[in-house]
């Protein structure tokens, strides 16, 4: 089985992941702008959250062009790490009461679902690699 076939299988299992991570990146940019406007600690957190939140989808796009199964898995793992980092920043924003802390609940739910999907993709890809 080639890497391209593996990618198609993952997409067939979760066809919405690229669209969801793109929408999440768009919401990340919106929250980044709100955090920067708020100033203070929010100003400092904003760039780190922006980097993590926008790189999830970018790394999935790179995974799509992976040259091997191992390359595909590595890139999806990077996307997973970035999703976990974005989740950390969202949790911090929420519990610290940084503006707009009330707006992050939906984003936190979405990133939790993205993490779960990416874990499934990585597990299936690794299983496929081991079973060939």
Where do the protein language model's features map onto the residues?
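Short, C-terminally biased terminal segments at protein or domain edges
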Residues: 1-132
């Amino acid at each position: 089985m080639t890497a391209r076939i593996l990618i198609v299988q993952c997409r067939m299992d979760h066809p919405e992941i690229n669209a969801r991570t793109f929408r999440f990146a768009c919401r990340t940019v919106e929250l980044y702008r709100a955090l920067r406007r708020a100033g203070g600690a929010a100003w400092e957190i904003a760039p780190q959250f922006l980097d993590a939140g926008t790189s999830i989808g970018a790394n999935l796009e790179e995974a799509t062009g992976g040259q091997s199964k191992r390359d595909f898995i590595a890139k999806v793992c990077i996307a997973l790490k970035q999703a976990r980092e974005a989740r950390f920043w969202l949790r911090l924003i929420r519990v610290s009461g940084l503006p707009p802390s009330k707006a992050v609940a939906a984003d936190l739910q979405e990133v939790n679902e993205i993490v779960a999907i990416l874990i499934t993709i990585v597990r299936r890809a690794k299983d496929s690699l081991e079973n060939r």
